[in-house]
Amino acid sequence: MIIKRIGPSFINLAKNHKSLAFLIPYACIMVFLGLSDAALQTDEGGDTYISSTILKYGFPYHQDEVISAMEHARVREDGLFIYRTWIPYYLQASSLFILGKTTFAARLPFAVLGVTSAIALYFFTLKLIRKKNVAFLATLFLISSVPALIYFRTARYVGLPILLTVLLIYSYITIFDKKKWSPWPITIISIIYFHTMYVSFAGIILGVLIHFYINRKSTAPDNYKRATQAGIITSIFTLPWLWFIFPIFEKIPEFYIAQGDQIDISSGWRFLKHFAGFIFQLNNYIFPFILLPLLFIRSLRTYKNEIQLCLICTSSLMGVSLLNTIPFQQYMAGSFPLLSILLALIIIEGLSVHSIVRSTLTATLIFTNLIHVGPLLSIKETFGNNPKWFSKNFYMKSTYNTFMREVKLKYVFYQHLLEISNPYKGPLDKIVAFFKTNGKPGDSCYIDNEHESLAYYTGMKVIHRDDIKALDNPDWIVLRGDYRHAIEKNLPSEIAQNLREILRKHPYSKIELDAPAIRVNNTYDIQLHLFRSPTSADKIVIYKRTDY
């Protein structure tokens, strides 16, 4: 009976939405191809190791009997992990439980939900705009967006706000339908969203509330009561968590203050700096803001309310995200589907041009960043001729270097195709391969970067970068990151002195690994992401203890 019902429904779906026959396979290729080629990089390794503790203890912890992870965010004596909300960790732990502790298992749930995001965006756009061609193009933009694809392929929570934003706003806009509104979908999704990434949820739900207040007369009065009920139930299942994790709000700023003048967390200008950082990144990779005025042209007045919703939610998300210590683009991931809709709306409904022109513009937006950074090239030339303007402090120098590096013509979509079709191998991949042959679980090993990832793959007792003592005598010492020159250059830091003392007191053989001495395997930050396997004349050095 169930099969008889599903069969015709699936056939009707395929007939009515033929573009999905292209979009779904395309999304699968872009997300899944080469998914497990590279080892888990530093942030992936840390989160995945936290997830693996769930398999041992039932709850996420900072430590197990092998190593500890993210000690900078530890606030409870029992080591219970409360730095972030738990749903992504239980999601990943389920995959590890079923498939084992592999790279593929660590990334699989996030990749699956990435493809689901594309499908959800198609139907959400169709519901919102009521145009199949706009729904198709918005979805195409999202699954051709390299930052989004990298997030979907990352073993972390960073891509989940994309899906949850779509589901949350979809459940919200049904309140304006001419039928009885059920508050349960938005309630359940809100609770899940909060316990996935509460800062992103706060931004989107704030936008929803603002939009609802502005358009409250467009829905039935009975829905006010139902919306209030949804808010109360959501609060019951979310607000206690903020009380539970309150100590973390003091702990994390302390960690960043220790970083010196690299990060501004106290000056009155920090919010403006963060705002400029978010706008710069979104403009360069997601939505070229030179097109923003087109949203207010006459041909798009029919979609005034829909545009308003997307802009309000994007703005509120950015406003809340300004509270973060660093303006990472990942905090704006929830805006990606909304900006994709606006971009598709401009091209399909806003421009009265021939279809060939639309296709050319679409291809330009996907394959190049010409429209994104073109208006900034003249500014870059001016800055390049006046570098002294940015020499006052480290922050200004860093901002200048980022601007000069990022404002140039790029073809990141093409580079992504190269990455997924050619196995990426970074320094950590070579290190893991070396120890799977030469090391064994239980060996003690000091490594100056990505210790969680190494422990995840090898089962070795890995010593954290800053925890090495002069009295330690690890079986292995790997220098490839922050302290790779600690021995030869006679660095004065305590860690460098401890390493030199260990090598002086104990016999070690020196091995030079044919891998570049780079501190991280890769990163999901599009501005720093490597698409091809790196090379360097500076090689990783491994010391093996020889007195046994």
Predicted regions mapped to residue ranges:
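Membrane-interface helix-loop-helix junctions at transmembrane boundaries of multi-pass membrane enzymes
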Residues: 9-18, 122, 127-128, 132-133, ...
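Transmembrane-helix motifs of polytopic, lipid-linked glycan transferases
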Residues: 21, 108-129, 167
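Transmembrane-lumen/periplasm boundary regions of multi-pass, lipid-linked membrane glycan transferases
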Residues: 52-53, 192-196, 201-302, 318, ...
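Membrane-interface transmembrane helices that cradle and orient dolichyl/undecaprenyl
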Residues: 127-132, 166-186
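Hydrophobic/aromatic-rich transmembrane helices and adjacent perimembrane loops
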Residues: 151-152, 161, 202, 288-292, ...
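Signature aromatic-anchored transmembrane alpha helix within multi-pass, membrane-resident enzymes
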Residues: 231-235, 347-399
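Aromatic/acidic, Gly/Pro-rich catalytic loop(s) in extracytoplasmic/lumenal soluble domains
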Residues: 346-347, 369, 473-548
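Short periplasmic/luminal acceptor-recognition loop of GT-C membrane glycosyltransferases, typified by
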Residues: 397-480
